[in-house]
Every structure is written in structure tokens, then in C-alpha cells.
Amino acid sequence: MNNVFEIINQARRKNKLKRELQDNQKKIRDNQKRVTLLENMLDYIHPTMTTAEVIAVVENMKADYEDRVDDHIIKSAEISKSRRDISRKIRELTEADKKANK
């Protein structure tokens, strides 16, 4: 019976990680769009139109967004690994419970 509770607990944890992964993927997508936007801005902003400081600010913003995308990609990989580990543990617990009930 303890395995049943553990299986339920692990399944809930796995579902929570799935939701977190989806949220993280949305953040990746949003930040990639921002990077694209800033790249386009850099194509249109020239020193003759504005000061070089504006370009430096835009480049810094772009670098910040790229760093965020990288951070979210790493976090997604970590979450995916946790989900796989939980799935493996659920499978092992289920098999052990089946053997114990035979």
C-alpha cells in the first residue's frame, strides 16, 4: 500500500514538472522573439539617426535576452531529466507493487 502512495506522489510531482517545463518553454519562445526584435532594431538604427549610446543599449538588451534564453534552455534540460527519473521510479515502484501482490 505504501507503494501506491509513493506512485501517486511521484505522478503528481511528474505532472508538476511537466507544467513547469511548458511554462519554461514559453519563456524560451518569448525571449527568442525579443532577441529577434532587437536584431531587427539593430538593422534599422544607424549612428546617423541616433547616438552610438542607443545602439550600445540595444546591444546590451539583446545580450541580456540571449542569456535568459540560455538559462531557460538549461533549466528545461534539468526539468526533463527530473521527469525521466520520476518516470523510471514510478515504473520500478509499479513493477515492485505488482510482484508483491502476486
Curated annotation (Swiss-Prot):
Job of this protein: Pole-localizer protein involved in the regulation of several cellular processes.
Organism superkingdom: Bacteria
Gene: tmaR
Keywords: Coiled coil, Cytoplasm
Native species: Aliivibrio fischeri (strain ATCC 700601 / ES114)
HAMAP family in UniProt: Pole_loc_TmaR (MF_00683)
Cited Pfam families: DUF496
Family membership noted in the UniProt record: Belongs to the pole-localizer TmaR family.
One CC-aspect GO term: cytosol
Residues passing through the membrane, by range: none
Keyword Coiled coil: yes
Cell location: Cytoplasm
Coiled-coil segments on the chain, per record: 7-34
The name this protein goes by in its record: Pole-localizer protein TmaR
